Curated annotation (Swiss-Prot):
Membership in a protein family: Belongs to the short-chain dehydrogenases/reductases (SDR) family.
Positions annotated as active site in the UniProt record: Y173
Name used for this protein in its record: Uncharacterized NAD-dependent oxidoreductase MAP_4146
Keywords: NAD, Oxidoreductase
Pfam families from the UniProt entry: adh_short_C2
Sequence positions that bind substrate: S160
InterPro entries for this protein: NAD(P)-bd_dom_sf (IPR036291), Sc_DH/Rdtase_CS (IPR020904), SDR_fam (IPR002347), SDR_subfam_1 (IPR023985)
Gene3D superfamilies given in the database record: NAD(P)-binding Rossmann-like Domain
The keyword Glycosyltransferase is annotated on this UniProt entry: no
SMART domains given in the database record: PKS_KR
Residues annotated for NAD(+) binding in this entry: R20, G21, Q22, D41, I42, D80, V81, N107, K177, V206, E207, T208
Protein EC: 1.-.-.-
């Protein structure tokens, strides 16, 4: 499913949560296909309820360096996707610098653990605020620029396998990701007349800091039945897939080779959701 070399030549991509993990892989992969990159990340703790270490401004600088190593330009900004004004300012700055916007990868997201009735308000508000509301704010800021550019384009919403199934132990995360599925499909219809495609991807077990194996194992130890909702991947029974493998799918969706697809949900799961 990898894009063809140079398949995004001359295009511009906007990527959230780009300082490390999947977001960095998406930025570098799209740059390798020829796109200039507008990238942002909060680069700071989101909430005390999110216990894994946050990305840093230096991480975002490294993403920019890796993009530039591909011979492409990078415009980066430290911002919170919950901050509407900051998002709009970055989009405006990107349009001023590059003159167009062709691809949006709404990737920013956070995760915490707990049973539904035991979640704190802070856990709920943080996960829903970043994953669902933050994605909506990203789309609200970028879609007018894509329409104005008049080149059609592709929006890739990074959901999760949790957006297609139940995930005991993080129901708030699952709710946010199911919400992205509805948002994706509605937007696909609304943007059809502008030639802009909208699809969601649903990765499973990707090696990023968000995985936080210790926290996951702790909740499985306390509630052993939950583990049945997290099966092994048939073609990779052990370990996690890499962020670069997910980026291959994003590159394909960003380019013209996936031009027949809009309003689709693509599991990036190596078969795990078939259990």
């Amino acid at each position: 499913m990898a894009g063809q070399a140079g398949s995004l030549q001359g295009r511009v991509a906007f990527i959230t949560g780009a300082a490390r993990g999947q977001g960095r892989s998406h930025a570098v992969r799209l740059a390798a296909e020829g796109a200039d990159i507008i990238a942002c990340d909060i680069c700071a703790p989101v909430s005390a309820s999110v216990t894994y270490a946050p990305a840093s401004p230096e991480d975002l600088d490294e993403t920019a360096r890796l993009v530039e190593d591909q011979g492409r330009k990078a415009l980066t900004r430290v911002l919170d996707v919950r901050d509407d004004a900051a998002l709009r300012e970055l989009v405006a700055d990107g349009m001023e610098q590059f003159g167009r916007l062709d691809v949006v990868v709404a990737n920013a997201g956070v995760l915490s653990w707990g049973r539904v009735w035991e979640l704190t308000d802070e856990q709920w508000d943080t996960v829903i605020g970043v994953n669902l509301t933050g994605t909506w704010r990203t789309l609200r800021a970028t879609v007018p620029a894509m329409i104005e550019a008049g080149n059609g384009g592709s929006i890739v919403v990074v959901s999760s396998s949790a957006g297609l199934k139940a995930t005991p132990g993080n129901g708030h995360y699952s709710a946010s990701k199911h919400g992205l599925t509805a948002l994706t499909n509605t937007l696909a219809i609304e943007l059809g007349e502008y030639g802009i495609r909208v699809n969601s991807i649903h990765p499973y077990s990707v090696e990023t800091p968000m995985i936080e194996p210790e926290a996951m194992m702790e909740i499985f130890a306390r509630h052993p039945s939950f583990v049945h909702s997290f099966p092994p991947m048939p073609v990779q029974p052990n370990g996690f897939m890499t962020a670069d493998e997910v980026a291959d799918v994003v590159a394909w969706l960003a380019g013209d080779g996936s031009g027949t697809l809009t309003g689709t949900q693509i599991p990036v799961d190596k078969g795990a959701l078939k259990y």
